[in-house]
Amino acid sequence: MDGSHHDWLEGRGPKLVLMGYIDDATSTVEARFYDHEGTVPALDSFRSWVQRYGIPCSVYLDKHTTYRSPQTPTVEEQLQGREQSQSQFQRAMSELGVEVIHAHSPAAKGRIERLFQTLQDRLVKELRLAKASSLAEANQVLERYLPLHNQRFQVEAAQPTDLHRRVPARLDLNTVLCLKTQRRLNADSTVQHEGHVYLVEDRLKAQTVMVHQRLDGSIHLRCHNRALSYRLVPQRPPKAPPLVNPVLAQTFLNCLGFARNPDDC
């Protein structure tokens, strides 16, 4: 898994990043275009793979900060025995039981890089023929191209057993492939997150709740894996500045600027 930064549309539209996956066993490829490489594109593209093929045993990727957090581990993470802080992507992989393997050299990324070289030739030509000039159009071309690519380059696995796991029936991927942030529950049952205030309507004894921001942008609050009822607290409009009489204000300024004796005012 990796992201390819390339002028895929050859100047006809915005710069795009191709999030690509290639299966070690069969060379099956899955990919999707995004406007940047980051946590949400990584989670969204991984979701596409899981929905199509199942949950892989491991995922091989580079040391991009999306996939490997540069931050020092928190106290909670240290108590859990982690030597490094987890990125949102690492946390999601851990919850799904997927081993994360980081590439330590350019040679270790050779397979995905060779795939990108192929796509930068073949796929770019398809995009050119379709006159794709936007993110949506590029993904439409990609959806038509990938089955043809896999039909040509896909191989039989050395072992017939598919090591992908099915998504458990009770597992909602939305609760895993999302952005999770722990927030303090205030005494008035409110939670603050990214400039918004949410009022939790359930009675809780907990001091913290988890804020889930899903890939569609929606917000969900959970506590101990239970969904919470809440409502957004409307923000109060900023107070208007006091009205000032322009005549009195000008008189006051004149006194400050020109009066040498207070009796002159």
Where in this protein do the model-derived segments appear?
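Short helix-capping and hinge/turn segments at secondary-structure transitions, especially at repeat
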Residues: D121-R128, A132, E143-A158
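RNase H-like DDE/DDD metal-dependent nuclease/strand-transfer catalytic core used by mobile genetic elements
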Residues: G3-L18, D24-A136, D264-C265
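Hydrophobic alpha-helical segments, especially N-terminal targeting/anchoring helices
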Residues: I22-D23, Q213
